[in-house]
Amino acid sequence: MTESNIKKVALVGGGVIGGGWATRCLANGLEVVLTDPRPEARDYVETMVADAWPVLEDAGLLSENKGQLHFAQDIAEAVQDADFVQENVPEREELKISVHEEISQHAREDVVIASSSSGLLPSRLQARCAYPERLMIGHPFAPVYLLLSLIHISEPTRPY
């Protein structure tokens, strides 16, 4: 097993799925930067992490080092230094397309961008991305912090 180059994860959306991703990433010792326009998102995510932590501990799924959780004011701030971006906004096509457009404008051009979409075509989400080949579907099973995810690579892609 090799060490991952991913140290900092940006999460766009802090609802059930985003909070679950935050918990999973923190349990694996990653730095997490989360953005969500809803004022209650911060408390929601912090509560989710606190509630899930004993479950992860009992299951032996915590790394030696707990990651750090930070909150950003907007997408640009959240993704600017991220090594991986996971989008978790509501399942509305135009919203997701717009969010992916903004992410692609501010994330490094070598960063993979995943969407938690459960039913939208990746090719549609790529429509306005600066680097459409970076986008993939990374849809989690519930609870996100315990179960593996379904990954779907979209077209076109480019090797890294």
Model region roles, listed by residue range:
Residues S98-L146:
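Rossmann-fold NAD(P)-binding glycine/threonine-rich loop
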Residues M1-V55:
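NAD(P)+-binding Rossmann beta1-loop-alpha1 motif at the extreme N-terminus of oxidoreductases
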Residues G18-W21, E94, S118-P122:
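Short glycine/serine/threonine-rich phosphate/pyrophosphate-binding segments
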Residues N28-L30, P143-I151:
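Acidic/polar active-site rim loop that often engages polyanionic ligands
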Residues V12, A72, N88, S115-S117, ...:
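Structural motif
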Residues V33, Q86, M136-G138:
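Hydrophobic/aromatic beta-strand patches that form the interior of the parallel beta-sheet core
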Residues I151-Y160:
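Single conserved hydrophobic/aromatic residue that forms the stacking wall/gate
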Residues P37-Y44, P54-V112:
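Rossmann-like NAD(P)-binding element
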